[in-house]
């Protein structure tokens, strides 16, 4: 039974959830209704806040198959609950007449997943998701995704499009003809409208949601309570504050919704043409598109309303919305395996692996290319929220909660305050009963103590520091869409950097070329643009093997391609639409050298000149293009020289990959050494290759050939050497981070040795440090996976004869201190393939490699995300800085992701820098640290404020008195609010320091600081309260009491006689009240100064002019009304007149209190800096962070780091813990 009741949906995915079924129970509902009436609606609120309780209180468990309501719980660390109502989709609403037409409609794919099943099997397709007789499908919607009941798996499953389980063959064979109108209508019923609907909630809806926040409900309760106790002014002030807070909150929430709505509305409804089965073209709204529709891409381009795979023609697309890369990308049609080499036909289509053939939703198609008047067609694979843009919008609409120790501790602290309030509550009731106070008064006063202990202004106070930090970040050009992350950035202790465009300049400069002739390298050449090379295959490859296109007459495309094309100085011409329509086999793109290079290229006499005039029109047409793929690390083209019978294939890409696809006899013997020399110097190297194609390959065959048939058996032609200069600010920024004990890691798509060289140049790896390259090989031919360890020579050792000798001595890890993890003497470097193998087969090595991994090269976008996760698993707080191009996932996953791209892709990143420079990283960390320390200061201050006020009220309750309405008002508005909002204004300290701020409130030093201040304040308040009773002039105060000088007293009393009867009711005017009011008012200011920390994370508090001015003004004002009473002020604040001598005594109490408080707070700071490290080293305490614990372990591990030229093998059978053994190869 239990198995039937609890199931998992989205298994293995980020949004994996447990699902439980429930049915509504009438008797439970009746009991809950009664409870709601009895509690005056409070139970209803409680059930509104807790979906789990709501469902369990009103429903009974049921089998998921037949339930009315589902309860969902996330399986991550947050264990969040959601509930959703089951709805029924009736297929009878759509006129499906005969069973025959029904099976036709289903033969193209069943209801949930449009895989290609045989028609017979698909006849039962619908019954998987519904009861066939009634034609009804049960489903629920959660976070904008529909989950349908699937009978095959006996669970709910979300609707998939053509992006899963569909082979490339079937895309052409089964889906390229288009849908019938009936099938389209049927799918429309299931998939719904194709739109990413970001509904902007009405102000009323937002208001209700905001007002029903537990915090505002507590404030409402407080206001009602104070009003019944006749604290009208204070209640009114809190109401005004709450309204201001709600209005500002509503404004910012609605503004974000409107921004998001505008962002997705650009393509929400456009008119599109679709092909139907009978070749007819129908024009429909984009909202009516369903997976399987064949969409015609218009000539003049469009904004894509869905994800679609190209099956005809070529498109130039701007994908900046998704990737942040403003460079136009060329998309070609999906290779058709049925006309290609056999054996590839089973490859499944996947939008990620086939992204060069997929047009993504929200991206802009700038131009289309087509042949022989054919239409450019694409098959819709995903619609609505399933599209790549839809998923991005969903991640913004439903973000994962940020798990940060500070917030967890804040809740714990609030619980402590509630416990303290509970004690006060019981004390007040007992004290009032003993003094025979009326029941009504007891209830009001005992509840009042709760509202005093839990300060209503706490959430506003806590966010003040973050808001100010956000404003300061904006001033230095860093924009933030997730303000809560600013505090988390204060904890960052490791930052990952992308290389190209982040650490180095965006563009590459051509340094030179090194050609190969007869399998030997020629000497490097600087100039490619000369007559000698103009007709060489090498230059032809540079001229044709690229994805450049002309947009409005300007060459655009990949910056690397542009640089290469500009270096040869050729001209690119593209066919116009008219030409394409006229000629049967027009080549869409033609390249030719400039005229001045050609005639001079023939050093012939006049008589021969005429013969050369004809072929002087030397042109190469690009027949077919296989775009660059980061997975394959290469691109290739098929081209033909004008007049030649045979076509040529050209290829360029990563040297290792290109060399492996060339005939071994054409690759120079010293290829590896030459390549290594260039990469060690930090050059980016690209290899070129070429081969003549067979004459039987016609233009038409080439259009359908697979790239594997072209990309083999090539002739190696040589290398292009590109220079990627470091950005000017890079070394200085990295040095600042190292000084601050913040580790830096490079994650790049570039060659490993180039990356290691750049890491050395920028100071990420110091000259004396060792680099260990981990080369992991997957299991093959029955052999287990293994890692080969090589020690990369440092640059200085390259030409040194002792290079081999030095490799034999591994350098042992040296630490100055535990924290000083940056002082490691060795670094690991690996590429993406090795990283994947290690993750899969060597799980126990992953944490060790994370501790010292510095260079990760040739990393694919998803591997970057996996790396961030692996670092977070060893308790690093990880920052990621990239240009947004392919770092979206990593930027989102990191604790603090900062994108250097101003484009819309930055919606994936919590932070975006206006200036594309990594100097924003230390700035962000500094501001994060300042905001974090501000949060601590404010929290400590608010805690003290509530305890001081709580104790003042408890003392006064003991004599059946209380603070007056205007006394509360003065303390809460004039003192607390002013202090809280000005103490948060301290700007960040000028530089990053090695010390790191604490991450949580529950730390020894912090708790000791708060507790010591509480004891001091309680002590001095009690001293004043009890000492005033010992004074010779003291008596229980009554309207005619005269403790002051006669004249002063008469003046004061005469002005008050009218109001006495009213004031006596609450017994507010007495000597104890006046004493406690003055001492506590000073105490608030004393702890504000004590807690306003400056160095090393914030500027000193004397530089915070608003704070200094506010505190001085309040000090002077309180001191003035204490020493020189003003009748009108005393009347408003309900202060009684006390002798001048007692006023001076109070001043002395306050001064001693200030001295003790500030001295103790300073000593706590000193104790933390001096004694804590000593105590830790004496106690041999195990560090909390996994990486620090691991560092301690590795210090005594004789087997680590691995010795050079050794191999680590995975143990074949023990797979679950990924154990491994080390084998030394001699």
Swiss-Prot record:
Q: Which residues lie on this side of the membrane: Cytoplasmic?
A: 1-28, 50-205, 254-409, 470-940, 984-999, 1095-1105, 1165-1226
Q: What class of enzyme is it?
A: translocase
List the catalysed reactions. Answer: putrescine(out) + ATP + H2O = putrescine(in) + ADP + phosphate + H(+)
UniProt-annotated binding residues for ATP: 498-500, 628, 684, 750, 883-887
PROSITE patterns the UniProt entry points to = ATPASE_E1_E2
Give the protein's biological function: ATP-driven pump involved in endocytosis-dependent polyamine transport. Uses ATP as an energy source to transfer polyamine precursor putrescine from the endosomal compartment to the cytosol.
Into which family does the record put it?
A: Belongs to the cation transport ATPase (P-type) (TC 3.A.3) family. Type V subfamily.
What this protein is called in its record is Polyamine-transporting ATPase 13A3
Species of origin: Macaca fascicularis (Crab-eating macaque)
Taxonomic lineage of the native organism: Eukaryota, Metazoa, Chordata, Craniata, Vertebrata
